[in-house]
UniProtKB/Swiss-Prot annotation:
Keyword Membrane: no
Gene Ontology MF annotations: 1-(5-phosphoribosyl)-5-[(5-phosphoribosylamino)methylideneamino]imidazole-4-carboxamide isomerase activity
Pfam family for this entry, one: His_biosynth
Extent of the signal sequence: none
A single GO cellular-component term on record: cytoplasm
InterPro entries: Aldolase_TIM (IPR013785), His6-like_euk (IPR011858), His_biosynth (IPR006062), Isoase_HisA-like (IPR044524), RibuloseP-bd_barrel (IPR011060)
GO term, biological process aspect, one: L-tryptophan biosynthetic process
Protein name from the UniProt record: 1-(5-phosphoribosyl)-5-[(5-phosphoribosylamino)methylideneamino] imidazole-4-carboxamide isomerase
Main location: cytoplasm
Reactions catalysed: 1-(5-phospho-beta-D-ribosyl)-5-[(5-phospho-beta-D-ribosylamino)methylideneamino]imidazole-4-carboxamide = 5-[(5-phospho-1-deoxy-D-ribulos-1-ylimino)methylamino]-1-(5-phospho-beta-D-ribosyl)imidazole-4-carboxamide
PANTHER family attached to this UniProt entry: 1-(5-PHOSPHORIBOSYL)-5-[(5-PHOSPHORIBOSYLAMINO)METHYLIDENEAMINO] IMIDAZOLE-4-CARBOXAMIDE ISOMERASE
E.C. numbers: 5.3.1.16
Keyword Oxidoreductase: no
């Protein structure tokens, strides 16, 4: 059954909520300015949010490092140490550091840009050689593939192309049932941000959610996490209906714990309890 999942997005060492399409540059220590539109910048440490998810038993939450600033690593480690082996971590994960982050207490590592390489047409596409290698190294049960995407309308048809590099680079990889089935052989979950609506609080991409439910590989029910645009607790009911309970939903900027005015965290917790056989 569909459930609410939490997030902790970290940028320049702080927990933030950012409009997805505006994250155009890295937050390295040498970068003095940022073009990112920030909906929320927390004065609290990442551990505050990790403790909140722990206290209310919100399972499967992800910690995302939005840039290479070393302070992001410190904040991610602080969150992981607050609830060891229960939070997922992503951002800059590769073959060399995946096991390190598991050792730091992550339940899973989330793969994003590293998975993609240029093809013969000089376009980026998912590299199954890399995916197989890292899956073999750490085990598919510890691996999540981030397939966040942007909407592209071609000849009147809507496609969702996987986007990398802070969602600024559109790859040659298109989401489909066949593609998700192929990737699912090497990982435990999918994380899919709808980058065009991320952080806007103007509604979810309902057609994408519906398609994800239809495309869901056997055994991946409740292992696809959608993020982007959630603005009401009713979005959980919508996602449950559209995906037939197969897709989970993340809330960010609309949530009161991130100074949002639209959704109460405790209401989402209660929704999970009322709609889950395991809670």
């Amino acid at each position: 059954m569909t459930k609410f999942r939490g997030c902790i997005d970290i940028h320049s060492g702080q927990v933030k909520q950012i409009v997805g399409g505006t994250l155009t540059q890295d937050d390295s220590a040498s970068s003095k300015t940022s073009s990112a539109k920030e909906n929320f910048v927390s004065t609290k440490p990442s551990s505050h949010y990790a403790q909140l998810y722990k206290d209310y038993n919100v399972k499967g939450c992800h910690v995302i490092k939005l840039g290479s600033n070393p302070a992001n690593d410190d904040a991610a480690k602080l969150a992981l140490s607050t609830w060891p082996h229960n939070l997922q971590v992503g951002g800059g994960i590769n073959l060399d550091n995946a096991q390190y982050w598991l050792d730091q207490g992550a339940s899973h590592v989330i793969l994003t840009s590293w998975l993609f390489t240029k093809n013969e047409q000089d376009k980026m596409e998912l590299d199954f050689g890399k995916l197989r290698e890292i899956s073999k190294l750490i085990g598919k049960e510890k691996l999540i593939v981030d397939l966040s995407c942007r909407t592209v309308i071609e000849n009147g048809k809507t496609n969702w192309y996987v986007a990398m590099n802070k969602w600024q680079t559109i790859t040659d990889t298109i989401l489909s049932a066949e593609f998700l089935l192929k990737v699912s052989a090497y990982c435990d979950e999918f994380l899919i941000h709808a980058a065009d609506v991320e952080g806007l609080c103007k509604g979810i991409d309902e057609k994408l959610v519906e398609n994800l439910g239809e495309w869901c590989p056997v055994g991946f029910e409740e292992k696809i996490v959608y993020a982007g645009g959630a603005k009401s607790i009713n979005d959980l009911d919508t996602v449950a209906k559209l995906s037939k309970g197969k897709v989970d939903l993340t809330y960010g900027s609309s949530l009161d714990i991130f100074s949002g005015k639209l959704v109460n965290f405790t209401d989402l917790v209660e929704w999970n309890k009322a709609n889950s056989k395991t809670n």
